[in-house]
Amino acid sequence: MNRKWFYLLPVGACLCAAWVVRAAAPSSAESAPNKILPATATGDDLIVHEWGTFTTFSGSDGIRLDFRPLAAAYSDLPDFVRDRAFGFGSPWSKGRIRGKVRMETPVTYFYTERERSIRVKVDFPKGLLTEFYPPVQSFLPAFDRKVGTTTGETIGNSSLDWGTVQLIPASAFRPQVSDPKDAEWLQQQILQNLCLPGNGHYTAARATDSAFVRTVEPLPAKPVIDELDGFSNMPGRRHLEKFLFYRGVGKFELPVTATADASGQVSLINKGDAPLTGAFLVQVRSGADGRPTLWRTRVAKVPVGSPVVFDGPHLVTDRNKFYDEIVSQLVSEGLYEKEARAMVATWEDSWFTEIGTRVFYCLPQAATDEILPLTIEPKPQQTVRVLVARLEVMTKSDETRVLETIGKSAVERTERIKAAGGARIEEAPIPADLLALGRLAEPALARAKSIAREETVRTEAERLLNQLQNELQTR
């Protein structure tokens, strides 16, 4: 990735942040700003809200498969987001990291009616925290350049420590001018241009009433030269953002398993300690005109131990209405409406336009706190964490299509070998139908290899799997 470096400019500078919310037209209630603190809170309270996702992939049998969820080809983060290799002059290959769970974009919001300083640290005992912004004071485990660029870093006992974080409420940026309308307009212009510009997915998460977070990048013991771009990394800069962001990959079990039978019907079994407040089944299919069609159904509750079967799914004819349904579920879990809409806007493309079958449910907060302990000092009066589990499932028909693609590739390979008359042949490109699966192509090939009946298909699946893995390691 060709990194670009930005300095925090004065408030009056034009940094042009794009505040994009594509998920749905705001409701009438949304036109008014969220009340920063709940009615039961005092003006001195600190409220913390967080949302994010855990993504897994399984075959129709429900067994979760390893994949390489962080390959650069599938990353959509702005250049200013930091990673573990930053400052080491290292072309760190995230594509070498394998895991069963991708932890995507947890963003942590802070609500306060006065400026204050806090300390923030997050731990991931069974994972590796790989990317973050603003910069942290320290992270564990220490980055090992040799391991990170060869076999891939070990997953486990990871943490990020932002150290001291200054919180600045939006009200602090209201200009002292006599006309209230002018003051309001000027404040909005200032707020919309304070943060670094990023892509639509990242900046959508900023559309809330949360306080700004300000950090100061730590100074290294000696200047670090980036060997790739040839410039000096000069920390000590101030960073301003609307939230704390981090991402990672883990190896742990989530409480719910999804399976698909021969008819395509999807079932859930909850092996956790608490019932779930609902789950959505979403299918995105390729339409007759080539555009994706969206199908959905929902179960109101997923009890512990008893299988739950989805009916449907049913064609979504009004996407905005469906997005509102998702927003309502997130709000019922404790998020503010603007936060819920920001989350849906962030994930709209990935959740609702990528071809496939997926189940969504909200992880109980007790489970989130165990998987991903968050420490904030002083302790907030309220902490709400809503992590959405996304279970990507290969249906029987999906598995059949992948097997057919692999079989066709095997036939074409045999024909090329015959035509070459014993001469060496060049490696053919991976079939487009497999590449269309993105980061899920690797586990799909692994699943196909395990269920294929013909030896030629198993052999071809192995070849394609090796080819894909080699390509991912170079990205």
Q: What residue ranges belong to the model's regions?
A:
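Protease-labile, long low-complexity intrinsically disordered regions enriched in Pro/Ser/Thr
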Residues: P26-R475
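Bacterial N-terminal signal peptides that target proteins for export
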Residues: M1-L9
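Intrinsic disorder/low-complexity segments
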Residues: C16, A25-P26
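Sec/Tat signal peptide C-region and signal peptidase I cleavage site
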Residues: V20-R22
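Bacterial N-terminal signal peptides
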Residues: L9-A18
